[in-house]
């Protein structure tokens, strides 16, 4: 059984984690991290469990096709309240009319529903492809993110998730870019994110760039991109299941100080053949970074025929709560 750690134990075992991890990844030099520095955080870590609506992917998609089937976002929010989540990450895909924005009447109704439940929106997110060689594809993604920044502002959501990876029909960023160099593609992605971040600054919404296992599949790649964007309204969404390295915990530790949102997954590479995530270790890393805010979990089918959102989500939430309690500084 896990037991709470003392303040001395916690500081001894975790305060040096990001530095040690970063050094192992070859990024902590004498000058430290020179760009994309995280914002100042005071008051110690405070972690609030949230749920990414994508955990109900199949049921939400079924409802979109037939309102008599599955569940909608309102029911997802009810589920969050019933199980004691503090927030909900309402992915844009599941709003009516996506990729277009829903009308204000819908947003107001959903926002009031969430308020009545005592919840908050921890974020939203859209699809975009900034690795595409076609500038029209990149421009389309910029406009979509800008539109959903305004949606987020209306809902009171602090972040909009953006991808730095390719999207279908492309199989990877190399195909999407037409064989362009990594540096060229990073420049495309950074330029698009800078424009999005400028728009986010006007509305008080942060563009949260998620690692998704393609163009961004390591912590150093994630940090390199943020350094190139170099905008205070662009930061990291750390997906614990999409750093495709030998030691994903090192990547997570490197990026934790730059995180404004999370996707805590069940396994380290979002497959049932990869190791189960050590939530106590993840939470220790998050605490060491001083992060204060929402920690959304996301469960996925991952090929399981018996996957049931209503079973897996409470199970993972209980494990996250146990990890939070076990790492509480006493």
Model-flagged regions — what are they?
Residues 87, 159, 261, 293-294:
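Residues at the N-termini of beta-strands
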Residues 92-106, 129-133, 168-172, 212-219, ...:
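Acidic-and-aromatic substrate-binding clefts and catalytic sites of carbohydrate-active enzymes
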Residues 119, 205, 289-293:
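A short helix->loop->beta-strand "cap" motif at the edges of active sites that frequently abuts
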Residues 152-175, 203-212:
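Active-site groove signature of glycoside hydrolases
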Residues 186, 190-284:
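Acidic/histidine-rich catalytic cores of soluble enzymes
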Residues 280, 287, 293-298:
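H/E-rich (His + Asp/Glu) clusters that bind or coordinate divalent metals
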